[in-house]
Amino acid sequence: MGDASASTSAPATPTSTLICREDGNDLFSADPADDDGGGGSGGDWELSIADDDHVLLMDRDDEYLALMLSKERCAGGGGGGERGDEEEEEMVEEWMKNARAWCVGWIVKTNAGFRFSLKTAYVAVTYLDRFLARRCVDRDKEWALQLLSVACLSLAAKVEERRPPRLPEFKLDMYDCASLMRMELLVLTTLKWQMITETPFSYLNCFTAKFRHDERKAIVLRAIECIFASIKVISSVGYQPSTIALAAILIARNKETAPNLDELKSVVGSLWQQLDTGHVYSCYNKMMIQEDRSMQSTTEVASSGVSVAHIGGSEDSAMGGANNATTLEATPDKKRKRLHSPQRQ
C-alpha cells in the first residue's frame, strides 16, 4: 500500500477542504430515541429525519437541478471522479469484494455506534472506494484495510460532524494513534485533499419535487434505505450520485413493476436527456438484485428464529473471515424483470 509515513507536500491551505458545512438541519441522523450510546447491536439502527419537513421536502427547480447535473458531469464520475466500469468490476478478485463488504459493514456499524449522520457513513465509504480505485492492496495485508476503514470514517466525521471523535475513541487496541494518523495522511494525499464529496442524498429532494406532498417523505426515506441496502455491493465510484439517487427513487416509488422511460421522464422532466439512462438502469438492476437477496435473507432469518442482532457477525471478527464469506445468489423466485436501457426518444 505504500509507505504511509513518507513525506508528502500538502496544499498551502489544506484545512479549507476539511471545514464542516453543517447547517444544523441533519436529514440523515441515527435514531435519537436510543440514548445508550451503543448504537444498537449488530448494526441495528433506524432511519430518521429532522422534524423540519421543509428541509427534507424543499422544492428544487429544473434550473438548479440542471446546474447540479452539469457540475457532476464536470467532476467526471461518482464521488471523487473515478468512473466505474462493469468489466473492470468483474475482474476484481472475490476476496477484495468480500473484504470491501466487511469494511463497509464496519463503517456503517461504527458510524451508528457514534450516532453520526447517515451521510457521514456514506462519505466514509466514498473515501474508501476512491482510495481503492487508486491504490492496490495485497491479499496478505488485509489488516491495512481495517486501518483504512478507521481512517476513512475518522476523516468523514471531521468533515461532516460538529463533534468528531478523537482517534483514541475508536478503541482499537491493535493500532496506535500514530498508525491511524499516518493512514489518515495517506488517504488525504491519495485523494489529493479533495474531501468535499457529493452524495446521492443531494438529489433526493430534487428528484421528488414533482411528487405529491403526502408521498414525497415516504419515498425519500425508502430511497435512503435502498441506497444503504446496496452499499456493500455497489461501489460509490461506480455510478454518479445522481444515478444512484434516481435508481433508488424508482425502486422506492414502485415495488411491483419495473419502471419504463415514461416514469423516468416523470421524475426528472426535461432533464432526463442529460442522464445516462443505461447507467440508471444498470444501477437499478444491481439494487434490485440486492433487494431480492435482502428479502431472502430476512425470510430465512425469520423462519430460523435467529435474532437479527446476530446478522453480520461479531464486531471483533478478523479481516480474514471476509475471505471465507459465502456469496449469496439471487433467488430465482419472484424476481423482478431486469431492465434494459431503451433507445432515446
From Swiss-Prot:
Q: Which InterPro entries match?
A: Cyclin (IPR039361), Cyclin-like_dom (IPR013763), Cyclin-like_sf (IPR036915), Cyclin_N (IPR006671)
Q: Where is the composition biased (Basic residues)?
A: 334-345
Q: Name one GO molecular function term.
A: cyclin-dependent protein serine/threonine kinase regulator activity
- Tell me, what is an example of a GO biological process annotation in this record? G1/S transition of mitotic cell cycle
Q: Where is this region: Disordered?
A: 1-44, 313-345
Q: One GO CC annotation, please?
A: cyclin-dependent protein kinase holoenzyme complex
Biased composition of type Low complexity is found at: 1-17
| Keywords from the UniProt entry | Cell cycle, Cell division, Cyclin
Q: Is the keyword Cell cycle in the record?
A: yes
Query: One Pfam family, short name please?
Result: Cyclin_N
The entry assigns this protein to a family as follows: Belongs to the cyclin family. Cyclin D subfamily.
Q: Which PANTHER family match?
A: CYCLINS
User: What is the official name of this protein in its record?
Assistant: Cyclin-D5-3
Q: What species is this protein from?
A: Oryza sativa subsp. japonica (Rice)
The lineage, from the top, is: Eukaryota, Viridiplantae, Streptophyta, Embryophyta, Tracheophyta
What gene is behind this protein?
A: CYCD5-3
